[in-house]
Amino acid sequence: MSFPKSTLSEQDLIKGCILNDRRVQELLYKQYCSSLMVLCKSYAKNEEDAVEMLQDGFLKVFQQIDSYEANKSSIYTWMRTIMIRTAIDFLRKQNRKNISVEWKEEHEPVIEAEALQQMSAQQIQCMLQHLPTTTRAVFNLYVTEGYNHKEIGELLKISEGTSRWHLSEARKYLINLLKAKERA
């Protein structure tokens, strides 16, 4: 799903989208859909969910494009933020139950950083697909997007302790898979 970059400037793309020009909206979509699809796949359990997240996200982009402020961020960064929030909303809808698990700092396992560094991003994302939805979302938000546990808790409507627990579970899962791979 790779498309050539648009010949229009970023400003012209934004202006066209604000004017609801379908041709320009299609150009914006084609320019960014591949990289944003990768982002959606990192949150989705399957391809269909990722496509739904992407489509919902682009709908929000086009509906909110007039609120984009070029002096604050690039259009890609702004759209990426919308996609992340759309993915979280999607996960929330699918995971209506609000589980709260309290986790104390002293129970945080020592993470074998070297083991995780040996894995490619693609290997990690493939392995993450087997994790529960919330655990995968916490891992992505913390490791990939750089959110802290307080921010993750607010986004996912879970406690900071629950966020820490999900991150710990994701890391333990990845390390165990890596150890099993080394033994094979």
Where in this protein do the model-derived segments appear?
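A short, charge-rich alpha-helical start-of-domain segment used by transcription regulators
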Residues: I14-V38
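Sigma70-family region 2
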Residues: I18-L19, K45, D56-K72, K93-Q94
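C-terminal edge and immediately downstream basic/flexible tail or linker adjoining helix-turn-helix-like DNA-binding
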Residues: M1-T7, G16, C126, E154-K157, ...
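Amphipathic, Lys/Arg- and hydrophobic-enriched alpha-helical face
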Residues: Y29-E47, Q64, R80, L128, ...
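A short pre-motif secondary-structure segment
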Residues: V138-Y142
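Arg/Lys-rich amphipathic alpha helix in sigma70-family domain 2
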Residues: S67, T81-V101
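Internal acidic/polar
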Residues: S6-T7, R96-A121
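Structural recognition of an alpha-helix C-terminal capping motif at a helix-to-coil junction
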Residues: E52-L59, S73-R85
